[in-house]
Amino acid sequence: MNWYSFYYQSQNFLYWPWELEIPLVDWFILIYFSAYLSFLPVFFGLSYRGHLKIAKALIVSGFIGCMIFLVYPTSCAYQRDLNEVENFKLFYSFLWTQDNPTTLMPSFHVAMSAIFLLPMAKHSTSYGMKIFYGCWLALICVSIVLVHQHHIIDIFTGLILSYFSLKIVERIKNHG
């Protein structure tokens, strides 16, 4: 989808002008990439049924997100320049080579992380773990802007997408 959108669709820009003043914080790339580990607590902490619910929510979010990308493709207004990056150049080079600056809204990075971490927080019996999962998700949300990969609206739309994806799966389970 990202490749198709980059090469074959005209892009829309959806951001507030003041967002371009937000500095790139290079070490937040570590938090950004930690999203790819956010499935681990699910793997170890939820039952098989929990895994199925999350897998279905990921499928629902992928379908809805791709429809949004096709109808209203958005692009990143930040300029990608490795000279602005002091540390972690290899990480940024990898990210910017693999991920075109398109298909931003909703953020799958946020949606995926929320689909993994919100059920973990909900099912955790430890207040400390609930806070941990919430803080991890909040940091991932902030990281997508601080590494100049997304805009602020992408955070909110990613969270909304994850919420509705989890609710749709729950509703189907209860009425199915």
Please annotate each region the language model reported.
Residues 1-37, 83-88, 92-94:
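N-terminal transmembrane-helix/juxtamembrane module of multi-pass inner/ER membrane proteins
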Residues 22, 46-48, 96-102:
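Membrane interfacial helix-start motif at the N-side
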Residues 92-176:
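Membrane-embedded catalytic cores of phosphoryl/pyrophosphoryl-handling enzymes
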Residues 32-39, 59-60, 109-116:
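Core segments of transmembrane alpha-helices
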Residues 38-70, 133:
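Interfacial segments of alpha-helical transmembrane regions
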Residues 46, 72-76, 147-148:
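Short helix-capping/hinge motifs at transmembrane helix termini and TM-loop junctions
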Residues 1-5, 65-78:
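C-terminal TM-helix exit segments that contain a strictly Trp-centered aromatic cap at the helix terminus
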Residues 26, 30-33, 53-60, 106, ...:
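Alpha-helical transmembrane segments of integral membrane proteins
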